[in-house]
Curated annotation (Swiss-Prot):
Record organism: Acinetobacter baylyi (strain ATCC 33305 / BD413 / ADP1)
Domain of life: Bacteria
InterPro entries in the record: CAP/MinC_C, MinC, MinC_C_sf, MinC_N, Septum_form_inhib_MinC_C
Keywords: Cell cycle, Cell division, Septation
Descriptive protein name: Probable septum site-determining protein MinC
Presence of keyword Cell division: yes
Residues spanning the signal sequence: none
Role: Cell division inhibitor that blocks the formation of polar Z ring septums. Rapidly oscillates between the poles of the cell to destabilize FtsZ filaments that have formed before they mature into polar Z rings. Prevents FtsZ polymerization.
GO biological process: one example: regulation of cell division
């Protein structure tokens, strides 16, 4: 019987539930699971039925190419709070909503092998390059806006308890009081731009900052957030 259960996705997070604290067994089982599916770079939420050495577990998951983002409120909560690792409420899944509009950028890539002797002209095929989701309404508590293949532009604010998650950049032209997660899947060049920063959590490519650690000099200001050369979050106030 497996000691790790992958019970599905919470938005675009995968929830891992551990029934063992034997990290050798966890490594062995997860390696097998990861080899069978496309989980590389996946953002994961941690739950456990047994006590864990949380820091060691997080390091183990990172070494396997996963991105631990938070724990579910429960056995792991106290240890997570002690290291300022995010804790999510138990059994309160968010409602994934549809963006007001989605724009798809496509490119034509030459397929050199498919040429004809008469013309020697490469046959082209169309591939999706990038998507941008536009949303014009306030993101309410319990709602989540997700773009797995590009950027999000939110032309309104977001309430506490809401989430915006993009594999690329995030632009929010309003108050940010929820959780903003850019570069989901491991894109370190992703950036966040927001009109008024009061976020509960900020993350780019798995590097996160909880509300208490956001620099006080950028709170409620227009901010540009990115990863520096040391893969640390930088918060730059925008002057207009």
């Amino acid at each position: 019987m497996a000691d790790i259960r992958i019970t599905g996705r919470m938005v675009n997070f995968t929830r891992l539930t551990f029934d063992t604290n034997d990290h050798d067994a966890i490594r062995q089982q997860l390696t097998s699971i990861l080899n069978e599916g496309s989980y590389q770079g996946t953002v994961v939420i941690l739950d456990s039925t047994v006590e864990q050495e949380l820091i060691a577990l997080i390091q183990l998951l990172i070494s396997l190419g996963l991105q631990p983002m938070a724990v579910i409120d429960g056995i792991l909560s106290d240890e997570a709070k002690a290291i300022q690792f995010p804790v999510l409420p138990a059994d309160q899944p968010l409602q994934r909503i549809k963006a007001s509009k989605e724009e798809i950028t496509v490119i034509a890539t030459p397929k050199a092998a498919d040429t004809t002797p008469e013309t020697k002209t490469p046959i082209t095929k169309t591939a999706i390059a990038h998507k941008t989701s536009y949303h014009d309404e306030i993101l309410r508590t319990g709602q989540c806006l997700v773009q797995d293949h590009g950027d999000i532009i939110l032309n309104a604010g977001m309430n506490s308890g809401s989430e915006v998650i993009a594999s690329g950049n995030i632009h929010i032209y309003g108050n940010v009081r929820g959780r903003i997660i850019a570069g989901a899947g491991g894109n370190p060049s992703a950036r966040i731009f927001c009109h008024a920063l009061e976020a509960e959590l900020v993350s780019i490519a798995g590097t996160y900052c909880v509300a208490e650690d956001i620099p006080k000099d950028v709170l409620k200001k227009s901010v540009h957030i990115y990863l520096n050369d040391n893969q640390e979050l930088e918060f730059r106030a925008l002057e207009f």
